[in-house]
Curated annotation (Swiss-Prot):
Part of the 50S ribosomal subunit. This is Large ribosomal subunit protein uL15. GO terms for cellular component: cytosolic large ribosomal subunit. Binds to the 23S rRNA. Gene3D superfamilies: 3.100.10.10. Belongs to the universal ribosomal protein uL15 family. Keywords: Ribonucleoprotein, Ribosomal protein, RNA-binding, rRNA-binding. Residues 1-55 are annotated as: Disordered. Residues 8-32 have a biased composition (Basic and acidic residues). The gene is rplO. GO terms for biological process: translation. One of its GO terms (molecular function) is structural constituent of ribosome. It comes from Bifidobacterium longum (strain NCC 2705). Pfam families: Ribosomal_L27A (PF00828).
Length: 150
């Protein structure tokens, strides 16, 4: 095509090397004939082996023990927060609800909250809407606070 001619649709063609024919195997000795790239004799020449087959050796999935039991789909996973963390977040004490803990970024709103007894407190907390361990409850009540689960 000369430089001064206008390029037209019928003049377009793929770039050199852009289109490559796929290799047709088993069509003569000149190009991937006979064994067609599968190597010499044997199991993989004739057919394929299924996933997990180890050549007759006892396979891994049969060597390992069966898993026992089941996963309870209704198990309630609590988000835990310790008394020491409560004292950090609310040094003045007072009434603390789950919404306050979410606002401070201590817990998320996708699971219930449980307070554990790690740490000491001298300020009185009034916890609402949370569960508490026995040790946490006794420490909070000793400091003059209270815990309600509703």
């Amino acid at each position: 095509m000369a430089d001064n001619e206008i390029l037209q649709m019928h003049d377009l063609k793929p770039a050199p090397g852009a289109k490559k024919d796929r290799t047709r195997v088993g069509r003569g000795e000149g190009s991937k004939g006979k064994t067609s790239g599968r190597g010499a004799k044997g199991q993989t020449k004739r057919n394929h082996v299924r996933p997990g087959f180890e050549g007759g050796q006892l396979p891994l999935y049969m060597r390992l023990p069966k898993l026992r039991g089941f996963k309870n789909p209704f198990k309630v996973e609590f988000q835990v927060i310790n008394i020491a963390r409560l004292v950090e977040l609310f040094p003045e004490g007072g009434e603390v609800a789950v919404a306050d803990l979410i606002a401070k970024g201590a817990v998320r709103d996708n699971a219930p909250v449980k307070v554990l007894g790690d740490g000491e407190t001298t300020v009185a907390f009034t916890l609402k809407g949370v569960k508490a361990s026995a040790s946490a409850k006794s420490k909070i009540e000793a400091a003059g606070g209270s815990v309600s689960e509703d």
